[in-house]
Swiss-Prot record:
NCBIfam families: PRK14641.1. Belongs to the RimP family. Required for maturation of 30S ribosomal subunits. It comes from the Bacteria. This is Ribosome maturation factor RimP. The keyword Mitochondrion does not apply. It comes from Chlorobium limicola (strain DSM 245 / NBRC 103803 / 6330). It is found in: Cytoplasm. Keywords: Cytoplasm, Ribosome biogenesis.
């Protein structure tokens, strides 16, 4: 049996595919979250693009996704249920969930938790210097660690390379 989340994801992917040649071209799905049930159902859809998603693109997809959810092929995905739909971009503090999101964050500060060879979790805050590809696939990132605090001035760190499959969580950090 197909879960409600999978049905919603299928509708989102259909909306994205049908956006070719429109202002929605180049937008991709980051995540779908369904919270609550019945009249309390909240659907949160995060979309992004390689250049960042605009508000008008979010509203465009919100309308299209709602139409599909309410009447997909004559059969509503959410059969007569009330639901709140939120379509937005991943905000600051949202973890990077897809490899292609790293490309857009090149040059930005990230807080990364990864596992070393002994499977111990390590944490580093660093500037994403480069996204590394193997055979066209994003496989690793190069970070330049930064020290925070008063004693960090003039302290240059060596870049580190982290394989994507070792990264547990990577979150863009605010720079003040």
């Amino acid at each position: 049996m197909v879960s409600m989340e999978e049905k919603i994801k299928a509708c989102v992917l259909q909306a994205l595919e049908s956006a070719a040649g429109t202002k929605g071209e180049g937008v991709y799905l980051v995540s779908v979250r369904v919270k609550g049930a019945g009249k309390q159902t909240k659907i949160e859809i995060l979309l992004d693009s390689d250049t960042g998603i605009r508000i008008d693109q979010c509203s465009f997809f919100s309308r299209r996704i709602r139409e599909l959810l309410e009447n997909e092929g004559g059969t509503p995905v959410l059969d007569g249920e009330d639901f709140d739909l939120m379509v937005s971009s991943p905000g600051l503090g949202e973890p990077l969930l897809m490899p292609r999101q790293y490309l857009r964050h090149t040059g930005r500060l990230l807080r990364v938790i990864w596992k070393d060879e002994q499977q111990s979790e390590k944490t580093v805050t660093g500037r994403l210097q480069q996204v590394l590809k193997t055979e066209g696939e994003i496989t690793a990132v190069r970070l330049v660690p930064v020290k925070t605090g008063k004693k960090s001035a003039g302290n240059v760190q060596e870049p580190i390379e982290l394989m994507l499959d070792c990264i547990v969580r990577a979150v863009p950090e605010a720079e003040l």
